[in-house]
Amino acid sequence: MSNKMNEESWNRLSVFYQEFTRISLNNFHYNPYGPGDKELGIIGDVKGLDVLDVGCGCGQNSIVLSKWGAKSVTAIDQSESQLDYAKRLAKREKQDIRILKCDMEDMSILPDASFDLVVSSHAMNYASNIEKVFMECSRVLRYGGRIIICMAHPIWIVLGEALEKGNLNSIANYFDTKRERWDWERRSGEKIATFESTPWRLSQIVNALCNAGFVIKRLEEPRGYSEEEMRKIPADAIPYADAMWRNEEFIKANQIVPYSLIVAAVKQKEAY
């Protein structure tokens, strides 16, 4: 099962990922080298809300929402290594977060209508069935509850890596949505772990949300910061960045096409 492979790969990658990535504990992150929610203002006031973070990784966004005054925060992920780190981080930051091992395509351990807000940052492309994920998100949300998802922008999947590598011959086929297998590598080219992800088309994302009873309220396609802009911003004010080096090729490509697609929607009806 590809989801099992992703779980095992994140268990292998976790220590390296946390060592070589700088992720804010004070601003909700979306885009590498780009603005967070303090700048974009998508999430809004979370005071008094029960929040679910789907694919929480090491829990940085969960910790941020807890600090911002959420009534409760539940964080789920498949990777035990990531969750162990999340528990240590939450304890260090003195935040009371419920952290659970859970598959986002089957959240049956969570009761119906138990959350006001579901958030997810760059987890949805790992799903093998995005309709199942959105159906589950709808099930656990109360009526009028919101979902805010950030995922790989379909335009980036088609063009981004080609621009990053300076090789337009490697432009991907937008209509090919077969699962992709790829390696996470060190800068030296040494493979650390192998993952599978799905290059969801925009229509698949939108239709899956609509079929799950959501009404889309807002779309954002944030441009990442340029090198010039980053020179004027304190390093710790960038919510997500590489810790040891700066990926200049990615930064340049993200000035041309968006890396992330952010969708905010409201649950207003039963799933179809």
Task: Briefly describe each language-model feature range.
Residues 1-47, 60-64, 89, 146-184, 223, ...:
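Conserved class I S-adenosyl-L-methionine
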Residues 52-54, 58-106:
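Class I SAM-dependent methyltransferase SAM/SAH-binding core
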Residues 108-117:
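A short acidic, Gly/Pro-enriched loop at the edge of an enzyme's catalytic core
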Residues 116-130:
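A short SAM/SAH-binding and catalytic strip from SAM-dependent methyltransferases
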Residues 131-146:
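A short glycine-rich, Lys/Arg-flanked "PGG" loop and its adjoining helix->strand segment in the class I
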Residues 155-158, 190-203:
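Acceptor-substrate binding/catalytic loop of class I
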Residues 196-219:
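Short alpha-helix
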